[in-house]
Amino acid sequence: ETTDLHMNLLSYDYYQDKTTDQYGLARAIALIKAARAEAPNSLLFDNGDLLQGNPMGDFVAKVSPLKDGQTHPAYRVMNQLGYDAANIGNHEFNYGLDFLRRSLKGANFPYVNANIYVADEHRNSDQARHAFTPYVLLDRQLVDAQGKTHAIKVGVIGFAPPQIMLWDKGHLEGKVIARDVLETARKYVPLMRAQ
């Protein structure tokens, strides 16, 4: 799992203007490949807070915004690594919903969020519409120690803190609402298990 990459794709500290060995997805690539070689029955997830966090993120969002059909640089790398699924983190909302949705189109893996809903006339009812896919069930084949293949389903669900409605009010107010994480999990986890 990766989390809180904050657009640190390269092993570079933009604030110090020098390379670093402390962070960066480029640095993690070797670790991910080694882990997969050691445990071929593995899955790769990202927990969010990917698109914002350093000058590269600002550049992609504000200076040279994505055009239709362009893939966000983070997703170019993640697609190559074969991520299985990802969660939308609170910082994904920092540049607004249009940028987020345009960026997500470039991901070749599912993104989930169960507690953010469209702010329409149904927002406070059971007919409320999700702003994003609430969860996915991944069908995977695993090989046991004897070489036998087993089909399994892996449920992936994601949440964002409801505080995004305060933190990114200018981008989100009147467009989406956030529901309680625990309440949402109690609703969807049993549904996922039943499938």
Language-model region placement:
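Acidic, metal/ion-coordinating pockets
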Residues: 1-195
